[in-house]
């Protein structure tokens, strides 16, 4: 059974401005593992990576129904890729989490569907 659905879209140029020499932004948004991946990226690929993670975390918080804040922080949520490159959202939840991230020239978008773990 579907418990929640969340979607978020972010302008890449907004993230690009936040990344401009501001390691603090990445420390606030990305987990240590995500920052390790980000440090290997440059230019537009870095912007897309961070924007995708930002959108995924926002979409998850909307699917849960709390938004980012006291109950769920950016650092409570980690996005990894499986062996085929599919993004996987990792968090301490009892739900099955389905995540999709996409990018265009100007935007990154993510959608999260939460499903109850008992089928």
UniProtKB/Swiss-Prot annotation:
Binding site for Mg(2+): 8, 58
Catalytic activity: apo-[ACP] + CoA = holo-[ACP] + adenosine 3',5'-bisphosphate + H(+)
EC number: 2.7.8.7
Subcellular location: Cytoplasm
Keywords noted in UniProt: Cytoplasm, Fatty acid biosynthesis, Fatty acid metabolism, Lipid biosynthesis, Lipid metabolism, Magnesium, Metal-binding, Transferase
GO MF assignments: holo-[acyl-carrier-protein] synthase activity; magnesium ion binding
GO BP annotations, alphabetical order: fatty acid biosynthetic process; lysine biosynthetic process via aminoadipic acid
Cofactors demanded by this protein: Mg(2+)
Function: Transfers the 4'-phosphopantetheine moiety from coenzyme A to a Ser of acyl-carrier-protein.
Family statement drawn from the similarity comment of this UniProt entry: Belongs to the P-Pant transferase superfamily. AcpS family.
Record protein name field: Holo-[acyl-carrier-protein] synthase
Species for this entry: Bacillus cereus (strain G9842)
